Amino acid sequence: MEKGKTSRLIPKFMFSHFSHHVATGVLIPLLPLLRESFGLNYFQSGILVSSFSLAYGMGQVPMAILADRFSKRLIIILGLIGVSLSGICVSFTQGFWQMPPFFVLMGLLGGTYHAPASAFISQNISIDQRGRALGMHVTGGSASFLLTPAMALGIASMFESWRPAFLLLALPALLAGGVIWLTTSEPAEDPLIPDKGTGKRLAEEKAQEAELTWVGIARAIGILVCLTITMNVVFASINSYLPLFMVDHHGISAEWAGIVVSLIAGAGIIGSPVGGALSDRLGRKELILFSLTLSGPLFFAVTRSPLWVPLILSLFFYGLTMSARMPTTESLIADVVPVRRRTTVLGIYFFMTMETSGVITPIVGRLIDSYGLDPVFTGIAIGLCVVAGVALLFRRHI
């Protein structure tokens, strides 16, 4: 892809990322309205959530393999269109049991986006700007987490029904699929290599990477990626219970407690591009270890900060630090893994994060039921500090 086109590529994929998560993120904020409309109990509500989330995780690796085998661009386009049509179909359902199949379909088709999009972007952006580009791409998802609940509830309130929210918020993904289809093309090479100074060395490194086996990939980046997956899983589990922590520990209302997750997502709008850009300058490993090192102390600060300004600052910097490692890890994978396997490795990475989070979150909930929020959150903070200490001690071998 020509240089002029690459400068316009990232805004298109930021919009696609935003649209993807808007279409797939409508369910949770509208769940109370669905429960009221169909008279659902907690078990049935859980079926709706699980039918999407389990399929979403399970779809990552198969879709990534298809993208490596055929076309990343085609898989992305079909996925965006499919996710949109699935959301539209949900808006026309007339009974509870009509909904799970469409959420399963939405989840499977949702697996077409993250790994193929990250691989496609990395294949079109020069290696010295890859972290910044992937960081900007992540902000599209972060913005959707911040805005989707308000948009979904606002539309539902305006039309006095949940159906228009599913319908209208599915349309941007359809538009994004059309934009990617009409304005992008298959990349001719991987990746654009700087012409000055390091071009020869980078070309030699790329030739070596093309020969990497699965064992070689695991040796090169396995430990760092596992550290990131650990942070991702802990981050997802913590986010699930932070609103409850705000209510129980600080006594604030449930409505205000729900803003906590939005605040962390808002921090990601800054943290992702900054973290990606810093990784271009300082190195991928250094940024991942830096994020890991700060995660424990900052989460401990969240659990101990008094209400309002200190707590808001702790939450913001916690979200900032945790979001910095996402584009950095994607860039690390793109730097090392050959093109023919890159989407598959990214798919495995996203699969491990999503499915492990789904298992660990209820375990954390069970521990909270048994021992209370404060001891469990403190234990998690200490555990993160221990993991960071061990990683720093052996950093030369990672």
Q: Can you annotate each of these PLM segments?
A:
Residues M58-Q94, S279-K285:
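Conserved MFS/SLC helix-loop-helix module at the cytosolic interface between two early adjacent transmembrane helices
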Residues F102-G140:
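Cytoplasmic helix-loop-helix junction between adjacent transmembrane helices
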Residues L34-R35, L66-A67, G154-E160, M246-V247, ...:
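Interfacial helix-cap and linker-helix signal at transmembrane-aqueous boundaries
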Residues T184-A210:
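Flexible cytoplasmic inter-helical loops of multi-pass small-molecule transporters
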Residues H137-E186:
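Helix-loop-helix hairpin linking two adjacent transmembrane segments in secondary transporters
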Residues L27-I28, R219-A265, I269:
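Extracytoplasmic gate region of multi-pass secondary transporters
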Residues L282-T329:
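C-terminal transmembrane helical hairpin of 12-TM major facilitator-type secondary transporters
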Residues V336, R340-L373:
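A late C-terminal transmembrane helix in Major Facilitator Superfamily
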